[in-house]
């Protein structure tokens, strides 16, 4: 039996290598998809839409429930929610059996104002010391004003820890956004990586903060059951001098408790965490990234901590693309890339996820260290732009021509991606197009880890 098992494992790996060669043969040309999405309304869903999970505020039921990894290594989960009538009900009870809660913790409670808006009571509770690979049941709130959910913790950090990550950005709250979220909840994804531009509340004249409430209601069927890891984009800045609000990222910082301090960062805009077999580093275009800056020095330090024998996958999260052949935001990220690319390539990062451009694009491994504008570099990451979540600004379908040699596949459609990390050497990447309401895999490739393979 051991010999037979070895045979099938060898056969499986051989098939992967063949598929990889077929998908991305050396010197292959990129593809510009000819798919044209059927036009439909891209305006925001009304505040009373059935897509938003809403309760009578006087009942003080927890709403907008969302989970975030709360530490560096995946043994803490932060539970966040909102109540409206009072700050009471600030309890999370949890345990390994349904209706049998062996632990409880009180939440920290905060509020904020923005213009004439006052938020509900925003709760954050850290569930610490959790066992890896374990399903926990939890209840938020008290008595009749409570709700119950469950989540499964990630596997212990290690080189062959398998895990399925979802990736999206620029989501908004249109019918297209709702379809993206609904498709993702059925995809088998276990942790979502969100690379910026969230509610698009700033599309409203007064930066309508109510749209943060509706947006989190839209997501709850996923966010209450698995961690979403957040990266801020330009639509989270929300500081407008004519509104009297000058504090940047106010709603982001109040609502989304990313674990930046756990990685020694002093800002929620850039931080790192480990999950399964991957080491994630989120960096920010919207903070000083110049050589010698606080962010630059932090990134240098964090990259020096990466242990590829423990976390063979090194994945970068950042909102503005460094390689983008769409005419929208074309070359916007070049300045940041020129400063930080040497660090990223020297570290042999595997994948770089970005958003910002409302279309989809995947590149071959490329850098500009030995050329201008991007050429093949096996030490460089695969760049994936996933700013196609569904927001009200719509799609941008104009790409530069001819297609640059670094560009492998590009299409202006709504959708999301999954990264199925199988082991230390192989991950199956799929981009799921929202094909007129159905989830369709439109781009698929095996990504081979260059350090471990």
Residue ranges of each PLM-predicted region?
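Acidic, histidine-bearing metal-coordination/catalytic regions of metal-dependent phosphoesterases
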Residues: 2-167, 186, 412, 418-422, ...
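Conserved, compact domain cores that house catalytic/ligand-binding motifs in diverse enzymes
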Residues: 161-231, 236-237
């Amino acid at each position: 039996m051991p010999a037979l098992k070895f045979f099938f494992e060898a056969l499986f790996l051989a098939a992967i290598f063949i598929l990889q060669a077929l998908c991305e043969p050396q010197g292959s040309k990129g593809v510009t998809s000819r798919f044209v999405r059927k036009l439909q309304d891209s305006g925001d869903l009304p505040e009373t839409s059935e897509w938003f999970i809403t309760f009578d505020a006087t009942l003080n039921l927890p709403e907008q429930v969302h989970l975030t990894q709360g530490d560096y290594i995946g043994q803490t989960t932060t539970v966040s929610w909102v109540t409206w009538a009072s700050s009471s009900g600030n309890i999370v009870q949890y345990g390994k059996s349904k209706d049998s809660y062996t632990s409880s913790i009180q939440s920290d409670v905060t509020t904020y104002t923005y213009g004439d808006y006052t938020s509900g009571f925003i709760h954050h509770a850290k569930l610490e010391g959790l066992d890896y690979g374990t399903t926990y049941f939890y209840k938020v709130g008290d008595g009749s004003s409570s709700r119950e959910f469950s989540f499964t913790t990630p596997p212990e950090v290690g080189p062959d820890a398998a895990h399925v990550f979802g990736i999206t950005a620029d989501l908004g709250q249109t019918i297209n956004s709702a379809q993206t979220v609904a498709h993702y909840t059925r995809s088998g994804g276990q942790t979502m990586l969100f690379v910026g531009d969230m509610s698009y509340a700033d599309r409203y004249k007064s930066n309508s903060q109510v749209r943060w409430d509706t947006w989190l209601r839209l997501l709850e069927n996923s966010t209450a059951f698995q961690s979403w890891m957040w990266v801020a984009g330009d639509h989270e800045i929300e500081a407008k001098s004519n509104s009297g609000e000058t504090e940047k990222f106010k709603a982001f910082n109040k609502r989304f408790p990313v674990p930046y301090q756990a990685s020694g960062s002093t800002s929620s805009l850039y931080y790192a965490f480990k999950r399964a077999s991957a080491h994630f580093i989120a960096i920010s275009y919207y903070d000083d990234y110049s050589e010698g800056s606080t962010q630059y020095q932090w990134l240098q330090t964090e990259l020096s901590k990466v242990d590829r024998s423990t976390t063979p996958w090194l994945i970068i999260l950042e909102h503005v693309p460094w390689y983008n052949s769409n005419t929208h935001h074309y070359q916007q990220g070049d300045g940041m890339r020129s400063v930080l690319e040497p660090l990223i390539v020297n570290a042999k990062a595997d994948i770089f996820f970005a958003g910002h451009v409302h279309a989809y694009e995947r590149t071959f491994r490329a850098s500009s260290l030995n050329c201008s504008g991007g050429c093949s570099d096996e030490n460089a990451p695969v760049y994936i732009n996933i700013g196609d979540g569904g927001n009200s600004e719509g799609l941008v379908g104009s790409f530069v021509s001819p297609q640059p040699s670094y560009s492998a596949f590009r299409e202006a459609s709504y959708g999301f991606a999954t990264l199925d990390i199988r082991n230390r050497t192989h991950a199956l990447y799929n981009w799921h197009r929202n094909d007129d309401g159905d989830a369709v895999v439109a781009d698929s490739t095996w990504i081979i880890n260059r350090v471990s393979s």
